[in-house]
Amino acid sequence: MLQYPHINPVALQLGPIKIHWYGLMYLLGIFAGWYLTRYRAKVKPWAPIKPEQVGDLTFYVALGVILGGRIGYIIFYNLPYYFHNPSQMFFLWDGGMSFHGGFIGVLIAFALFARKIGANFFDLGEFIAPVIPIGLGAGRIGNFINGELWGKVTDSPLGMVFPTGGPLPRYPSQLFEFFFEGVVLFSVLWLVTIKKRPRYLVLGLFMFLYGCARFICEFFRQPDPQYGYIFFNWMTMGQILSIPMILLGAVILIAVFIKTRKNKCENI
């Protein structure tokens, strides 16, 4: 059995002001995304934005992630609770962010920013997709430090006892998601971007691979108590929300494949 490290969720306290690791992980993901996006804007001839525009894009994306992630969590996962406790909506440091809500928020941010600078929405998505897993991975580390979103009870050597998860060992599902949705997904997408490839291949891969990784990791994660299993006595809300991403990613990949076969797909 693994030992849970018991990290204080508060990284730094300055008088009454508490700086939480959860928030720092989001800041780390946003900063890393800004840095790599700026680098890509300098070296990629087809980049839909200029390096000096990356700061503004990062601001739009950060708002989309935070607002979309929080609103998505409230709507998708715990609406009755927040309806009766509206002040809790603003306590982001306690956790409670939805990737799928954040993804919708980012899509809206992309649409607004693309319209502002006159860029193509899908080109912008293709350009940003390789750096998104960094933020996903950082967020999962924040979940792990918070001791939330732990996995199912297990007798596996990978199990650990979480402070809020009862006395039995559980899968560290946050670390599984960090590895597959963060490390593996980033590595795959970044390697694909090194060489020329069909336009929108990376966008399709991101949506398809993330959806598959999340769907599989949900089998190790404890279902949300307010929902449990929604369909077939095994399907969770996270899996339901991942299915549209898998399907849309598959559609994009099939379209790219067909255009490539017909020599109608531009390589970038």
Swiss-Prot record:
It is an enzyme of class 2 (transferase). It is a multi-pass membrane protein. A 1,2-diacyl-sn-glycero-3-phospho-(1'-sn-glycerol) binds at R140. Its EC number is 2.5.1.145. It comes from the Bacteria. Its main location: membrane. InterPro entries: Lgt. One of its GO terms (biological process) is lipoprotein biosynthetic process. NCBIfam families: lgt. This is Phosphatidylglycerol--prolipoprotein diacylglyceryl transferase. The lineage of its organism: Bacteria, Pseudomonadati, Pseudomonadota, Gammaproteobacteria, Thiotrichales. The gene is lgt.
